[in-house]
Amino acid sequence: MVNFTVDQIRAIMDKKANIRNMSVIAHVDHGKSTLTDSLVCKAGIIASARAGETRFTDTRKDEQERCITIKSTAISLFYELSENDLNFIKQSKDGSGFLINLIDSPGHVDFSSEVTAALRVTDGALVVVDCVSGVCVQTETVLRQAIAERIKPVLMMNKMDRALLELQLEPEELYQTFQRIVENVNVIISTYGEGESGPMGNIMIDPVLGTVGFGSGLHGWAFTLKQFAEMYVAKFAAKGEGQLGPAERAKKVEDMMKKLWGDRYFDPATGKFSKSANSPDGKKLPRTFCQLILDPIFKVFDAIMNFKKEETAKLIEKLDIKLDSEDKDKEGKPLLKAVMRRWLPAGDALLQMITIHLPSPVTAQKYRCELLYEGPPDDEAAMGIKSCDPKGPLMMYISKMVPTSDKGRFYAFGRVFSGLVSTGLKVRIMGPNYTPGKKEDLYLKPIQRTILMMGRYVEPIEDVPCGNIVGLVGVDQFLVKTGTITTFEHAHNMRVMKFSVSPVVRVAVEAKNPADLPKLVEGLKRLAKSDPMVQCIIEESGEHIIAGAGELHLEICLKDLEEDHACIPIKKSDPVVSYRETVSEESNVLCLSKSPNKHNRLYMKARPFPDGLAEDIDKGEVSARQELKQRARYLAEKYEWDVAEARKIWCFGPDGTGPNILTDITKGVQYLNEIKDSVVAGFQWATKEGALCEENMRGVRFDVHDVTLHADAIHRGGGQIIPTARRCLYASVLTAQPRLMEPIYLVEIQCPEQVVGGIYGVLNRKRGHVFEETQVAGTPMFVVKAYLPVNESFGFTADLRSNTGGQAFPQCVFDHWQILPGDPFDNTSRPSQVVAETRKRKGLKEGIPALDNFLDKL
């Protein structure tokens, strides 16, 4: 099916029950791009001989060189199900042709923001797990994100060729390995999912249902239990009964699948299935999965890899595999690939699993609407999204910008959730800060062109109905990173994406030649557009700062900046880590600040959060948008807050959502509401730039104890109150034992047993500590988990490899913030050095400001 045209795709786009939007997610190097190849070659864009080597979706040169995926890439595939297979689909369908929009996403944790962007526009996910190394830290992170977005997972066990050829596992051991991975994945799903009673129903994966695939992307073969069940049903049917109708056949195959997994055994002597492991005459019976599925595969591997010519010929005939003339002369691995690919083609198995088990937009948008849309659940836009209605108002979410071949321009890449987007349509382009009824962050502009994304190429298309993924030309000037596009006047925004990592590593950049500064500024703007997570900031000292998730992420960003966006040579500083400011005790005095005109007084105290509250705010368990009483109850039950105080939270900060809280515990103050906005503004300002070195604050609760105000409104305006509030907040921080917090990575290291000692050495030198060490069952590999300060992580990978002879593979994920031990006021301590360096870098006055600047006497 190589030559399917845009018109054919366009025809299927209207059959929204036959669309599947899915992404491929996994831990780094578990083989996503390689697997995607077998799908692409099935839908016919790569020649099948090259599949497994081309990595079609790795479109950039550096992706091909480093052999990693950096940006998520979209591609549309067409697949036709046979009459027999259609009966397995439990949701509504429309004809036998399916359009699959597939997004291949990166596995490196540094690029997990790309994964988030991919997940937002898809409804299903193919989770790839390497069956040798099992479920890793990044598998868990991306799976958790997928479930939080209400995306249905199916599992693929990749790299079976390694299990057979390198580890030489027995069938029973291999079954146990699979069983363990399935259990691990289901534990993650049930931990973060909403249970069977939730809106999605049961999303646990189960080989019996056919939601688990097994195979090898590199060799291009794969199967689910369905393929083997069909072979055996056909075999048994051939013995006795005549032809079955498609519906009865589907029923028989489903029954058969139940027998092929779990504690079911097969007696080859009688040809019967049994539930006990021993036959009536006391022989030990083989498990059905091992006997009926793994055994034939092992036989093929054994015959071909040991060059048993006659046996190979017999097997090929028995399995009814038709080889090309050129394949017949091969031997060893090339022959193995050719045979397995003919017998169990990966494309078919995976595409069937995707079309049968992943939801169509019609199914998925019913339960995803409430998570996607911020507005009321019953306005026109929400109804359009829920029913995926092409006649409804246009609602579209742009999840990222894709650079075009033309420097400096971007395609806006996103998904149409309701309505129809077409060339020349006049739309409302709403950025993430838009609020209905206001004019800011809103543009009314026509769309210049709509295009289809096909991996490395784009195809122009007239219009695209809802449920599809599309690229737009001509809206990139009006959006940074993400936004909502709609034709409905009262539409609210689609919800902003939550990233699982935060940009904690920063680098200062400058142009080598000062005359190139304007190009650098322009380049930074483009960089901020092209990557969903990177932040570009200008410090007060005039420095340009780029913040990213980690070393690798920053390295790629800087390379892009130099070569694509700014096209000028760049100097960069050493990487610096962002810190947070916090307090460790309650303020020792009640802090008083007077306004500049001496007529208003504010009294406040600061105190630290109880453990875990800041993390809850980050996750969104406690947020500014929650229902008041519900939030108060949660705080009272979990953190033992006073209920009356918990109800009087004024706001969160910085930016209205951060992990600091301002509460009002005053008793009967007149005119208090009039100054609330001013105090809140001062609070946002103070929490964004803390007292120690103007870093964000974290985990501080401020209590307003008392306020005395001037009777005339004119003497208590914003100009009087905002700076006063800020001074008072600073004073309460400085009297509450202020501390610095540093970001900590969770490092997962895979290594053979003999080098574990070397790892401990490296970690101890870098202030890290190991908190878990486990052996991967059935292999000689160890997994070491440790906490490592981000500050010490630069060059960690190189250091680790040189100390372990290149046998250890680390994965760093940002995990939490931790207080840096020591007092910033003590000149010999580590925090005071950090404060001094940071203040110097930002061009602030030397030394922490004295308390007298903020605290007033009565």
UniProtKB/Swiss-Prot annotation:
The modification Phosphotyrosine is found at Y265, Y373. Its main location: cytoplasm. SUPFAM superfamilies: EF-G C-terminal domain-like (SSF54980), P-loop containing nucleoside triphosphate hydrolases (SSF52540), Ribosomal protein S5 domain 2-like (SSF54211), Translation proteins (SSF50447). The record marks E586, S587, K605, A606 as: Cleavage. It is found in: Cytoplasm; Nucleus. One of its GO terms (cellular component) is cytoplasm. It is an enzyme of class 3 (hydrolase). Phosphorylation by EF-2 kinase completely inactivates EF-2; it requires prior phosphorylation by CDK2 at Ser-595 during mitotic prometaphase. Phosphorylation by CSK promotes SUMOylation, proteolytic cleavage, and nuclear translocation if the C-terminal fragment. Diphthamide is 2-[3-carboxyamido-3-(trimethyl-ammonio)propyl]histidine. The modification N6-succinyllysine is found at K152, K272, K572. One of its GO terms (biological process) is translational elongation. Binds to 80S ribosomes. Actively translating ribosomes show mutually exclusive binding of eIF5a (EIF5A or EIF5A2) and EEF2/eEF2. Interacts with SERBP1; interaction sequesters EEF2/eEF2 at the A-site of the ribosome, thereby blocking the interaction sites of the mRNA-tRNA complex, promoting ribosome stabilization and hibernation. Interacts with HABP4; interaction takes place at the A-site of hibernating ribosomes and promotes ribosome stabilization. Component of the mRNA surveillance SURF complex, at least composed of ERF1, ERF3 (ERF3A or ERF3B), EEF2, UPF1/RENT1, SMG1, SMG8 and SMG9. Belongs to the TRAFAC class translation factor GTPase superfamily. Classic translation factor GTPase family. EF-G/EF-2 subfamily. Catalyzes the GTP-dependent ribosomal translocation step during translation elongation. During this step, the ribosome changes from the pre-translocational (PRE) to the post-translocational (POST) state as the newly formed A-site-bound peptidyl-tRNA and P-site-bound deacylated tRNA move to the P and E sites, respectively. Catalyzes the coordinated movement of the two tRNA molecules, the mRNA and conformational changes in the ribosome. This is Elongation factor 2. It comes from Bos taurus. The lineage of its organism: Eukaryota, Metazoa, Chordata, Craniata, Vertebrata. The gene is EEF2.
